[in-house]
Amino acid sequence: MPATQSPLPSLAATLGATHKDLSTARLYEEAIRRGEAVIAADGPLVVRTGKHTGRSPSDKFLVDEQGSHDDVWWGGFNRPISEQRYERLRARMVAHMAERDVFVQDCFVGAHLDYRRSVRAFTETAWASIFCQNLFRRPKAAERATFSPDFTILDAPSFRAEPERDGTASSTVILVHLSRQEILIGGTEYAGEMKKGAFGIMNFRLPDEGVLPMHASVNIGRDGGVAIFFGLSGTGKTTL
């Protein structure tokens, strides 16, 4: 199924105060100045993510649209939302962000040059932009000159969905449009939703290229043997 480029990258042109690809040091200063974070011993930033200290799977929906409908295993985890509701929510979320400072970060998801994808993240907070720098891979200077995002993330934690109007489970909402390769996040400050959304699109796309995505870590023994460790988050894969 071919993907269509998200129209969200042009959002930056419509916003008044847009901070594009700031350095970590500048973002650090902005996070402190704006009261988003405090400095802990030895200098790391500490933030509070409110009521959401982890992902909120019950608030996540995939857009049920023609381009991806037959390729999704619909059910309890992959829950559908109509394209009409998505468009209405998207318009309100974009309008919400247009009234705020927005931090824009261009990154790559994946290390392999043949399989990585480019992502542009629009975040409401400076610290979330640092999160993107740390979690994803930053382009080199030469790559920035020709950077074009394959998919887009819009992270608006202060946005609130209206369940009766929007068909959501709560005021928190995470929407993924697989054909447009857009991820919209509202009502949660937990930055891991950006990671999971990006990985979800990669997991959807890469099998068509003959690549098996795995939630795993790999270790190589002295004799060159390879061991793959599978497990849920926090089960010690990286430690092993």
Which functions belong to the PLM regions below?
Residues 1-226:
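A noncatalytic interaction/capping subdomain that flanks phosphate/NTP-handling catalytic cores
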Residues 220-240:
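Glycine-rich phosphate-binding P-loop
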